[in-house]
From Swiss-Prot:
The lineage of its organism: Eukaryota, Metazoa, Ecdysozoa, Arthropoda, Hexapoda. It comes from the Eukaryota. Expressed in nurse cell and pro-oocytes (at protein level). May interact with itself, with nenya and vilya through its RING-type zinc finger. InterPro entries: Zip3/RNF212-like, Znf_RING, Znf_RING/FYVE/PHD, Znf_RING_CS. GO terms for biological process: homologous chromosome pairing at meiosis; positive regulation of meiotic DNA double-strand break formation; reciprocal meiotic recombination. The gene is narya. Residues 172-184 have a biased composition (Low complexity). This is RING finger protein narya.
């Protein structure tokens, strides 16, 4: 800590505690008498800048009081602040690095999922083709089964008793010789006998009929 004194007349505050001291905006310490002389010119007697000053006492703002505090305390604060900010930067960098790692991991997983999707799509295409082949195979065998059933049903009709009797009759008729068949003259005489018989029966039925 330095000794507070006037930068113009070098008067010390400890030797003249009753004399007020001021801190100018240009960072100069001026005692009350020197400030009174310079206030007429409204310029700092040391650097010539516009004179604006605040009295040095316990009521001055913290931003002004820090100029009169022990610099070691500020050095410790600076170290703490520097360490805190360095830790925060390191944490931020670590978080960014982990985000990059997570991004790379997500990228690898996405590539794996894309490959898996391509494989699954290929399997789907193969399964669809296999299903189509199975449907064709099933349709072919169903048609073959229907044709077999139709053939069996047609064969059963040929083996019925009526069909057998008609078949045997046609075979026996076709096997007769021409000599066994009646001649045309015999058929005509048989027809004449039948007609005469019908006439006689009709005449006997109408004997007692009168108009």
């Amino acid at each position: 800590m330095f000794r507070v004194h006037c930068n113009k007349c070098f008067r010390h505050r400890k030797t003249d505690p009753a004399v007020p001291f001021h801190l100018t905006q240009c960072r100069h310490v001026i005692c009350g008498p020197c400030l009174g002389q310079s206030s007429l010119e409204k310029n700092c007697p040391l650097c010539g800048q516009v004179l604006k000053a605040i009295q040095i006492n316990r009521d001055m703002p913290t931003s002004v009081a820090n100029y009169f505090a022990d610099p070691l305390r500020f050095q410790q604060i600076y170290r703490k602040i520097s360490k805190f900010q360095a830790d925060q930067r390191a944490s931020d960098n670590l978080g960014f690095y982990r985000q990059l790692q997570q991004l790379e991991q997500n990228k690898r997983q996405l590539e794996g999922f894309c490959k898996m999707e391509a494989q699954l799509n290929q399997k789907v295409v193969e399964e669809k083709k296999r299903i189509a082949e199975l449907r064709t195979y099933i349709a072919y065998h169903e048609n073959a089964q229907r044709m077999t059933r139709r053939r069996h049903s047609a064969g059963e009709r040929f083996h019925t008793p009526e069909f057998k009797e008609a078949w045997n009759t046609s075979i026996s008729t076709s096997d007769k010789s021409p000599s066994d068949m009646p001649s045309d003259s015999s058929r005509r005489s048989a027809d004449l006998d039948t007609q005469s018989t019908r006439r006689r029966s009709f005449g006997s039925d109408t004997k007692g009929f009168r108009l």
